[in-house]
Every structure is written in C-alpha cells, then in structure tokens.
Amino acid sequence: MSKDKALDIVLSEFIELAKVPRPSHHEERVSKYLFEWAERHGLAVERDSLNDIIIDKPASPGCENVPRVIFQAHMDMVCVSEEGVDYDPVNDPIKVINDGVTLTADGTSLGADDGIGVAMCLYLLQDDTLRHGPIRAIFTTNEEDGMDSLNLDPRYLDGGVILKSEQSFHLSFSSAFS
C-alpha cells in the first residue's frame, strides 16, 4: 500500500473517531465504537471491566512463529473549548477542519492525543498488505487523569514487543517479559 493511501486511511479513521465523544471517565461510547469496529473487520475483540478494548489480528501465513507485537493507545482525550463555544464534551462530537494540510478543530481541542494513535492502530489492524506476526492493539481508558488501565490484566501483555508512542519521533519499546 502506498504511503498516501495509508495516510488517507489513518486520517479517515481519525475523523470518524472524532465523531465519538470521549472525555476521560466517559469512554463507554468510544469503547463500544472500537468493539464494533473490530467485529466489522472480523477480528477477535475483548472488553474488560474498565472498558479497555483488546483487539487481536492473527499472523500472516508463514509468520505464525514471530513474536506478537502489541500496540497501545488511549481512547480518552482532554476536552477544552474556546470561550463562548457551546460544547458539551460528553455528548458533542469534535468538528474537524481539514484544509488539506492541517487538521484542526472548530473551537475545541482536537483529540489527537491519542486519537491519532488509535487511528494508526486501526490502520495496522486492517491493512492486509503487510506481512506480520500476531498483532494486538490495546485501547485503554482514562489515561488523561487517572491511568486506571495500569490495572490491565497482565495476560493481555504477552507480546514479544510492546509499542507505544505519545510524541512524534519518540517511541517506547518494552516487553512484558524479559
């Protein structure tokens, strides 16, 4: 798949995600959205008691013995608005403005932290042109002010490599097992 096509898919997934309100402590709808997304794509999916979503994609043929790679992104966002903007973060979607170069929001925060991480994971889960070992995407809740998902069941962390990125050009590598 070309870089342009991949970028189009990531941006499309992000813009769709922005339609789902997702402030911290109110992730039920976005959790449901991601669960249903996985089902539509024929992927194994689980939801835990905190509404964290765990999606598994099997390995490409011939790559079954490659260690699982786990990608993690949080689904909640900081919700702020400019003074005078009528915005209810629990119920209102983000109005994304795409000028062809930059994505911004109409008077509110955009939710790129970590909505773009979620969108990138969704792209990886749906791209069937990549050869890969087993992939797991973990979408966690309440990262912005509580880090509730630190209590994630350790059985979900059985990967050879865990990839998480919060900043451009900075990638965290870790493993549940040394």
Describe each PLM feature range.
Residues 93-99, 163, 172-178:
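Short, intrinsically disordered, charge-balanced linker/junction segments flanking boundaries
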Residues 50-54, 144-146, 170:
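Short acidic loop-to-helix transition motifs that present clustered carboxylates
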Residues 63-134, 139, 144-145, 151-160:
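Active-site metal-coordination/substrate-binding segment of hydrolases
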Residues 28, 147-148:
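Metal-dependent catalytic neighborhoods of phosphoester/phosphodiester hydrolases
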Residues 152-175:
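A glycine-rich helix N-cap at a beta->alpha junction
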Residues 2-101:
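Acidic/His- and Gly-rich active-site-bordering loop/insert found
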